[in-house]
Design a protein with these regions (language model features):
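N-terminal strand-loop element at the rim of the active site
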Residues: 5-13, 25-82
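An amphipathic, basic-hydrophobic alpha-helix
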Residues: 70-106, 122-123
Length: 136
């Protein structure tokens, strides 16, 4: 079974550890099943967590966009919205191709959720989409 995590973030948020802990829990409590969990790395945002991911045997799928989070404007309302628009245009087609090619059983959506939800409405995937909202 393939489980992919969509959680692109533009600043440090607790959701990153929620994703890592979720994958660790799936691996720990599903010993009878062969479950392959992967995090989709949209714009190199997961590179600063690579050591933690490697330590926990968590694979990443590089979307290979030309975007780099360290070079994108993230502070302020308008600048962050501009970044969200860039992420949309640079990632929507690549995410669609990954879902079509890899055919994950589940796509767990954490952040910037409108991109996979738009794809869900446009295409008939076999993949089940799970929208997970963290916080309060």
């Amino acid at each position: 079974m393939k489980v992919f995590y969509w959680s692109p973030f533009i600043s440090e948020v607790a959701t990153t550890f929620a994703v890592i802990n979720s994958i660790k829990a799936i691996k720990k409590f599903s010993k009878n099943k062969k479950i392959n969990c992967k995090v989709i790395d949209v714009f190199k945002e997961w590179s600063s967590y690579q050591e933690i991911l490697d330590h926990n045997n968590i694979e990443t799928i590089k979307l290979k966009t030309s975007l780099n989070i360290k070079r994108l404007p993230v502070k302020g309302f308008l600048k962050s919205r501009f970044t969200y628009i860039l992420v949309f245009f640079f990632s929507i087609i690549k995410l669609h191709k990954i879902i079509k090619k890899e055919k994950p059983d589940y796509l767990i959506i954490h952040l910037i959720s409108y991109i996979p939800l738009i794809l869900l409405n446009l295409f008939n995937y076999q993949t089940k989409f799970i929208l997970r909202i963290s916080g309060y």
